[in-house]
Swiss-Prot record:
Protein name: 18S rRNA aminocarboxypropyltransferase
Positions of modified residues (Phosphothreonine): 261
Species of origin: Homo sapiens (Human)
InterPro entries given in the database record: RNaseL-inhib-like_metal-bd_dom, Tsr3-like, Tsr3_C
One of the GO BP terms on file: rRNA modification
Reaction equations catalysed: an N(1)-methylpseudouridine in rRNA + S-adenosyl-L-methionine = N(1)-methyl-N(3)-[(3S)-3-amino-3-carboxypropyl]pseudouridine in rRNA + S-methyl-5'-thioadenosine + H(+); N(1)-methylpseudouridine(1248) in human 18S rRNA + S-adenosyl-L-methionine = N(1)-methyl-N(3)-[(3S)-3-amino-3-carboxypropyl]pseudouridine(1248) in human 18S rRNA + S-methyl-5'-thioadenosine + H(+)
Residues where S-adenosyl-L-methionine binds: 74, 122, 145, 160
Chain intervals for the UniProt region annotation (Disordered): 1-21, 224-312
Gene name in the database record: TSR3
Entry keyword Iron-sulfur: no
Keyword terms: Cytoplasm, Phosphoprotein, Ribosome biogenesis, rRNA processing, S-adenosyl-L-methionine, Transferase
Amino acid sequence: MGRRRAARGPGAEGGRPRHLPTRSLEAFAEEVGAALQASVEPGAADGEGGPGPAALPCTLAMWELGHCDPRRCTGRKLARLGLVRCLRLGHRFGGLVLSPVGKQYASPADRQLVAQSGVAVIDCSWARLDETPFGKMRGSHLRLLPYLVAANPVNYGRPYRLSCVEAFAATFCIVGFPDLAVILLRKFKWGKGFLDLNRQLLDKYAACGSPEEVLQAEQEFLANAKESPQEEEIDPFDVDSGREFGNPNRPVASTRLPSDTDDSDASEDPGPGAERGGASSSCCEEEQTQGRGAEARAPAEVWKGIKKRQRD
């Protein structure tokens, strides 16, 4: 008989076992706390000096299709920092996969799945979804994200248009690991803004127990926002508001000059005929109508006089 062939592949000695033992959430939480502590050390949030892949207690992966600008792509930056590993088309990911073809929302019910197998995203352009081969990015746990607002500079303020790092962070917040979201968002100057914009919603989703409850929380939020729209408070002295001009002394709907002076004069001094009953009121209305007609003709006559003087 020949020699026994040496073991190969993920199950080989020294390699990663094919089936990992179940991970306790308590031990995972301790690893998350250690990773957060390492990320806040001096120099950890400055880019290349950040923590390596061993600093994160779970796997982060990404299918990168090359649709985005490499200088603005948050997924590529995380990959350069060693926080995310790139997958090729056709590779299967065993953890939670954020995909537009998912059938249910990510929820706290996925907490153990994320702790055990991690999260993967699809880095593609929102404008090219029709040509994205989602069937070649395989996974057993496809999920969607509920209503959230983007804070990245490209799609700031637009719902659902999250970048890769925002998708990772949202998933961690929903399943109950917000410290992991902080670790990733610290790599971007605008990262904290994502949590500030969506704090209320993320807390609502994290308090749910199932995908159905997350869907219900989303629907309730959107219904309340539609029923009670809040008027925008505008600071007239805010130079960064984006408004080119504005007059705080006049309502926006006003289309003609106010006639407060004429109305106040008429109300304060109605004339001697006002004490004589209804007949006097109709007479006053006729006089006011004639007066308004004369005022309407006056600007036209003045304009004709100006044009005549210009011709002369």
